[in-house]
Amino acid sequence: RSKQTLKHTFEQIGLIKNNNKVHFFSETHERYAKISLELFLENKFLGVGPKGFKKECVKKYNIEKCNTHPHNIFFQVISELGLLGIIMYIVLISLIIFKFFQCLAKEDSKFLIYLSLFIFLNPFFPSGSLFNNWLLIIHFVSLPYLYVKKYN
């Protein structure tokens, strides 16, 4: 009975369809990920440009498949910013993880800020657009605080 309940729950949230195929969050998220990878392969070095996902997606596919962004920070970075963006993204994520553990070891409360930055930039979960002003303000308003804490 518990297996059926678990399967039903996964079907409800779109992780498994009746054909028992497991999806990356949902069929739609999986489709956006595939489109992002295709756009990346066509524009490896610089990507299609910030906020270019929808424009390029509409050119390549029908409008029903396209959204303003791929709903995942990692896929947005590779499709819109290319290799240059992904290198900066990996460096930034690595720095955030390093600083998080450094602050955690020192019992410094700044680890919470690094944790929130990692959650925002997390490559494993669906997300809003990286170039959405509201999301950027919410998540990066803490950066001046880190600067002040470091030098005071």
How would you describe each model-predicted region?
Residues 80-120:
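Hydrophobic transmembrane alpha-helices and their immediate junctions
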Residues 112-125, 129-152:
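Transmembrane alpha-helices of multi-pass inner-membrane enzymes
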Residues 14-81:
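Long extracytoplasmic/lumenal interhelical loops at the membrane interface
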Residues 74, 85, 130:
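Short active-site segment of divalent metal-dependent hydrolases/proteases
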Residues 53-55, 77, 88-91, 133:
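Generic hydrophobic alpha-helical membrane-span motif
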Residues 1-12:
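Aromatic-rich transmembrane-lumenal/periplasmic boundary elements in polytopic membrane proteins
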Residues 35, 56, 73, 77-80, ...:
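Generic recognition of well-ordered alpha-helical segments
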